[in-house]
Amino acid sequence: MLMEMNRYLSFTLFTGLSLLTTIPIEAYTLNPNKTATSILQTNVIEVRSITSVQPIVIYCPVGTVPQLPYQVWVTYSDGQGEYRQTKWSNSALSTEQSEADDKVYPIGSQYTINGFIIGDDTTENGYPITAKIEVVDTKNTISPKLIAHTIPLNNVKINGNNRLTSNRDLAIKEIISWDVSQQLYNYRDTYGLSTEGYTRSDGWDSPETKLKGHGSGHYMSALALAYAAATNPSHKEILRRNITRMVNELRECQERTFVWSEELGRYLEARDFAPEEELKKMKGTWEAFDEHKTKWATYGYGYLNAIPPHHPALIEMYRAYNNSDWVWAPYYSIHKQLAGLIDIATYMDDKSIADKALLIAKDMGLWVWNRMHYRTYVKKDGTQEERRTHPGNRYEMWNMYIAGEVGGMGESLARLSEMVSAPEEKARLIEASNCFDSPAFYEPLSKNIDDIRNRHANQHIPMIIGALRSYLSNNDTFYYHVSHNFWNLIQGSYRYSTGGVGNGEMFRQPYTK
């Protein structure tokens, strides 16, 4: 009996991303009547290695950390080239702080920073590279124009019978199935209105959760975006009815704060709510909040939220994240509600409802301005205890874990400033937007110092989006540099291969991904 066996083996070896060798092996043919023979055939491809790297010369503005490239162009021995990821040796915080010190590196200083191209086995750490740094007396350059911007959803149409249209319609059907009364329950409870016939809220918007209202904000955004995308007339009509009901009932709640003070000769405002001595004694328990919500007449003109203003006021006393006793991200929830109203004002084609949604958002935005302008400040120097001597230091407020999480307040208030027409209101809303700057976070970033490490990613990414939106609204280049530096640091030091940048909602240490 003749038995023949052909085996083909192929070995492919990689170093980093570079293909080294492919070896197909035709092993042998066996015949019991013949002497066994074997033939080994090899086909070796020349090893590819990095032969050169594009020179790295950085002209670094004095008082800043060099903006080192997170990718560099390399050329291989086969003549091909590509961008490869880098890792630099100056990532220690103390090193960066020294590089940003104009006394250590004055104008005209020259020095080098070593690094590696990762994924290469030239050395244990990778292919060695060096950046030459020269400190110069110039400012960072500004991108002269927008490279890209979003297209308004109501200018986009998806046609035909396909997965996109199917998913759109499924999403809209889900949104119109939600009970609008459930989204209004907490507001009515907060403003002393009857909740009879209204479905009680649940989950993270339940009456026992201080994050309540954030889900209703998402709901309003969902209604607005679904309305802009809907093509089915019956779906569009249901969405219109739900939007109209939300807007009308929220305005009813808000108008209960329009309380005239004969003593002051004006309406009660945010600055009048909880004078300092009262604020210092304010409690954050649920028993206290049961009492707080009976005092809606003191909330201040324009306040609109699913929880009384005691919640955002408590952060002025630096109260910690604690759903039972203190706070849970007060301004995070306010942002979601502002964003939802702004989305309705943007996408609703019923002008009366769109205008009313904008009016609600504007009045709430001006409540925020009033509170920030008159009752808060920024003090950066001293110890934490010294910075917290008096209520309302935003340096401390926005640097607190979760309690100081403000979502996209900066972005929404800047966006709102672009939608109102009165110059004074525009100016106040931009000021309010910038009140949500975090000096402890922004100022190191403005110098390209990586103070991202170990921060709460969910809390700080929206701040950067707010900074970029502020730049578009006020043309202050400080905000551009903060945003631009953040992006480069994230791409080079924190981005995982999946595209994520955090672990457990937290940034970790640079290059530990």
Predicted regions and their residues:
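Bacterial N-terminal signal peptides that target proteins for export
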Residues: 2-12
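Bacterial N-terminal signal peptides
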Residues: 12-22
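Low-complexity, acidic Ser/Thr/Pro-rich repeat tracts that form intrinsically disordered stalk/linker regions
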Residues: 27-48
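Solvent-exposed, low-complexity, repeat-rich "mucin-like" stalks and linkers
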Residues: 43-81
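Detector for glycine-centered tight turns/loop "hinges" at secondary-structure junctions
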Residues: 63, 79-81, 122, 302, ...
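Serine/threonine-rich, repeat-prone extracellular segments and beta-strand-based repeat modules
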Residues: 78-134
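Extracellular interdomain linker/stem segments of modular secreted and single-pass surface proteins
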Residues: 134-140
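Glycan-recognition and catalytic cores of secretory/periplasmic carbohydrate-active enzymes
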Residues: 140-513
